[in-house]
Amino acid sequence: MVNQFQVTVLLGGRSAEREVSLRSGAAVARALRALGHGVDEVDPAVESWGLPAKTEVVFLALHGEYGEDGQVQSRLETLGVPYTGTNAVGSALAFDKARSKEIFQQNQVASPRGVLIDSPTSTPPDTIPAPWILKPATQGSSVGLNLVEDEVGWNVALADSLRHGGTVLCEECIQGRELTVGVLDGVALPVVEVRPK
C-alpha cells in the first residue's frame, strides 16, 4: 500500500507561463487525488501566499519566474517544507541562461556560441553567423525566444526578446533534435526527445 500524503500543489503564479502552469497543476492534482492523496491547490498569484497547515509536501507545478527561478524554493526551504524538484540554488542557476552557460564553459560542456545583449540598439554580433537564436536570459520554456534568419528580422526579434527580460542571450542556431535528461538524486534518467506539436 502506498503512503498517503497531504499535498499542496502550487500552480498558476504570476509568470508569462501562468496558463500552462494552471493546466499542468490541475492535471497533477487530479492524478494525486486518484492515488488517494489529500490535495490542496494554491495559486500564489491569487491567494495570500500561505500553505494550509496540514501540508506535508508541496508539489511545484509553477513555471517560469517565481516557479523555477529559486524564489519559491528558497521560501519553502526557509519554512522547512519538503517540495518536489531542484533546490533553490540549483533552480536559480538553471533558470539564468547566462550563468548556466558560464558553468557549462567552466566544466567543458559544449554549448552554442553566445553573447549577452541588453540594448535595443544592438546589432547582430560579428562573432556569430546567422541564423541566431535570441532568448531572454531569465525566462522559462520558449517565452520570448526568436529565431532570426538574417539582419532584416533582427530589430523586431530583439525588441520582442527584450520585452520579456532585461538581458537577452544571442546564440548561434544549432539544427538538430532536442533531447533532455532528468537527474534524480544524482542519477541520470533515460534520455527523452522533446517533440513540440
Residue ranges with predicted function:
Residues 84, 112, 133, 169-171, ...:
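Structural detector of well-ordered beta-strand residues that form the stable sheet scaffold
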Residues 64, 142, 196-197:
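Glycine-rich phosphate/pyrophosphate-binding beta-alpha loops
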Residues 1-102, 106, 118-125:
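ATP-binding N-terminal substructure of ATP-dependent carboxylate-amine bond-forming enzymes
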Residues 61, 92-93, 114, 146, ...:
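Glycine- and other small-residue-rich loops at beta-strand/loop junctions that grip anionic moieties
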Residues 41, 83, 111-114, 145:
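Conserved beta-strand scaffold positions in the cores of enzyme catalytic domains, especially
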Residues 21, 112-113, 132-159, 178:
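Glycine-rich phosphate-binding loop of ATP-grasp-fold ATP-dependent ligases
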Residues 149-197:
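Phosphate-binding site of ATP-dependent enzymes
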Residues 104-105, 128-145, 165-179:
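ATP-grasp fold ATP-binding core
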